[in-house]
């Protein structure tokens, strides 16, 4: 019988192996971060981890991610049980969102989610010796993000609508050489970009700018 419960820290490497099978690129560090800043949920067949998801409580906004079920357990409502539990844990949020591939869109619609928009994943292959730390242009208004952390957090809350401060602070601290802000002529932060990753793989985001 499948039981849904909090993901055990001892099963983080198993969770990584699940996402590895799909080529999602989640590193061990990513899973350690997710365990720390999200509400990690596991589907267990006895002591065996067969599915995972992560729920993020950002105050008024909740986010569900990393929904994945081991191939031999698919088609048995395990994914539905995981998402249902994530929604239960985010019931204090006024809105819950989930990022989905086109192949999985029908699954979320059956649960009750509505399509809100579409996104596209972009990929950049580069010589990693040149790619880390990220090179920036010579404009003096592009500066490291660490000195402007409070401004970044206020701006993100305005634009995102929820409070992602712990997540963003963790990313800036973990990879400061890949975190930048754009300043206007009055040295006011107008945008920021952060990234996560290690070795030969990086994912850019959140990437937020003020309108205009």
Task: Please state what every model-predicted region is.
Residues 10, 17-29, 155-165:
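Helix-loop element at the rim of GNAT/NAT acetyltransferase active sites that forms part
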Residues 27, 32-51, 63, 95, ...:
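A short helix-loop-beta-strand connector motif used in the catalytic cores of GNAT acetyltransferases and
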Residues 42, 48-56, 61-68, 187-197, ...:
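Conserved beta-strand in the GNAT
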Residues 69, 75-88, 110, 212:
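Conserved acetyl-CoA-binding loop-helix of GNAT-fold acetyltransferases
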Residues 73-76, 90-92, 201-212:
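Acyl-donor binding region in acyl/amide transferases
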Residues 89-101:
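Conserved GNAT acetyl-CoA-binding A-motif
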Residues 107-113:
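Conserved active-site tyrosine of GNAT-family acetyltransferases
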Residues 114-203:
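Amide-forming acyltransferase catalytic core, primarily the GNAT-like/NAT-type
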């Amino acid at each position: 019988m499948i039981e849904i419960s909090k993901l055990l820290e001892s099963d983080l490497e198993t969770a990584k192996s699940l996402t590895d099978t799909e080529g999602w690129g989640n590193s061990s560090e990513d899973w350690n971060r997710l365990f720390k800043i999200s509400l990690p949920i596991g589907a267990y067949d006895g002591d065996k981890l067969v599915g995972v998801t992560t729920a993020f409580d950002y105050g008024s906004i909740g986010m569900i991610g990393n929904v994945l079920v081991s191939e031999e357990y698919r088609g048995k409502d395990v994914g539905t049980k995981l998402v249902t539990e994530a929604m239960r844990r985010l019931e204090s949020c006024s809105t819950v969102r989930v990022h989905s591939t086109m192949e999985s869109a029908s699954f979320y619609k059956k649960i009750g989610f509505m399509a809100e928009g579409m996104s596209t994943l972009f990929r950049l292959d580069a010589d990693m010796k040149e790619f880390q730390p990220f090179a920036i242009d010579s404009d003096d208004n592009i500066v490291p993000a660490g000195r402007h952390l409070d401004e970044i957090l206020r701006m993100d809350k305005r634009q995102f609508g929820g409070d992602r401060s712990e997540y963003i602070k963790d990313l800036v601290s973990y990879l400061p050489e890949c975190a930048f802000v754009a300043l206007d002529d009055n040295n006011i932060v107008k945008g920021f970009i952060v990234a996560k990753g290690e070795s030969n793989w990086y994912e850019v985001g959140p990437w937020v700018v003020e309108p205009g």
